[in-house]
């Protein structure tokens, strides 16, 4: 039993944040997956989190993000650069990872999504390059059950590609988002389920309005026994043109081990479907 718990906690630590441990194994999840949820993402970052989110809004948007490890130790070290765009459900993204060995990882991601009357579905194809060749697929969906409640999920790593000698196993990620005070405030939860491990993520966010809108988010990741594995907190400022910063720490809150700076520009073409 203890061995199973140890395996689960180790997997959560690996997938939670792109730290030095990730670099040593030369595989890293996209930074957005460490602080967003599959039922509450509505911009190009949905390409990495839940491709169905690409169809929630009828807009054209672009984003970019820089992530560093160990920001509390001097200037930190650049680990990941990612960027992408979404044009009404058609999206493309690129991720570049810098590993300790000096090797560079490249991930190209293409997504397509559509939706109607609260239902959105999407698919994304990932091409892995940089010392490896692999192809994987994600399928995602979301549905507005009630004005304040959205449910959805993702089947990730279909095809189980091998990326730099590490197989990416099929993962089921169900989730839900509740908006008790309207669209400004959200409470989200999702799980990551594989045949051998289980983890949860709980998050809250708030997005203000006005001349200079400000936003805040927080997320806690746990293992299947609800023991803390990682924590993230973020702040943003702006409306259609927005910038933000996210800082992550291990579950014991011993200090920041990753941070990222992101920018997003959106041009809305119509009402959102959610």
Tell what function each PLM region has.
Residues 43, 73-77, 102-104, 131-133, ...:
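Short sequence motifs at beta-strands and strand-loop junctions characteristic
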Residues 21-88, 259, 266:
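N-terminal, post-signal peptide beta-strand-biased segments of exported outer-membrane/organellar beta-barrel
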Residues 57-61, 87-89, 114-120, 146-148, ...:
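Strand-connecting loop/turn motifs
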Residues 27-30, 91-182, 187-191, 274:
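Outer-membrane pore/translocation modules
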Residues 1-30, 254-258, 266-274:
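Cleavable N-terminal export/targeting peptides
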Residues 152, 162-274:
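Outer membrane beta-barrel transmembrane domains
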Residues 48, 80-82, 107-111, 138-140, ...:
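Membrane-embedded beta-strand positions in outer-membrane beta-barrel channels/transporters
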Residues 32, 37-40, 65-69, 95-99, ...:
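Outer-membrane beta-barrel pore domains and translocons
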């Amino acid at each position: 039993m203890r061995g199973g718990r140890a395996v689960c906690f180790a997997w959560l630590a690996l997938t939670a944040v792109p730290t030095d441990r990730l670099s040593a194994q030369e595989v890293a999840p996209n930074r957005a997956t460490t602080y967003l949820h599959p039922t509450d993402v509505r911009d190009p970052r949905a390409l990495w989190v839940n491709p169905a989110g690409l169809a929630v809004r009828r807009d054209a948007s672009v984003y970019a993000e820089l992530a560093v490890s160990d920001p509390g130790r001097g200037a930190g070290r650049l680990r990941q650069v990612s960027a992408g765009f979404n044009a009404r459900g058609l999206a493309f993204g690129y991720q570049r990872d810098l590993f300790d060995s000096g090797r560079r990882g490249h991930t190209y991601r293409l997504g397509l999504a559509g939706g109607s009357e609260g239902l959105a579905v999407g698919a994304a194809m990932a091409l892995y390059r940089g010392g490896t060749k692999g192809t994987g697929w994600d399928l995602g969906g979301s549905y507005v059950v009630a004005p304040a409640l959205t449910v959805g999920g993702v089947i990730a790593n279909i095809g189980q590609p091998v990326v730099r000698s590490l197989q990416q196993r099929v993962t089921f990620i169900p989730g839900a988002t509740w908006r008790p005070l309207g669209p400004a405030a959200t409470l989200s939860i999702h799980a990551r389920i594989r045949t051998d491990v289980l983890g949860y993520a709980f998050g809250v966010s708030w997005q203000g309005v006005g001349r200079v809108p400000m936003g805040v988010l927080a997320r806690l990741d746990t293992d299947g026994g609800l023991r803390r594995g990682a924590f993230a907190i973020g702040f943003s400022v702006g409306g259609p043109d927005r910038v933000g910063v996210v800082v992550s720490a291990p579950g014991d809150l011993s200090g920041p081990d990753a941070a990222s700076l992101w920018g997003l520009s959106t041009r809305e073409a119509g009402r959102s479907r959610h």
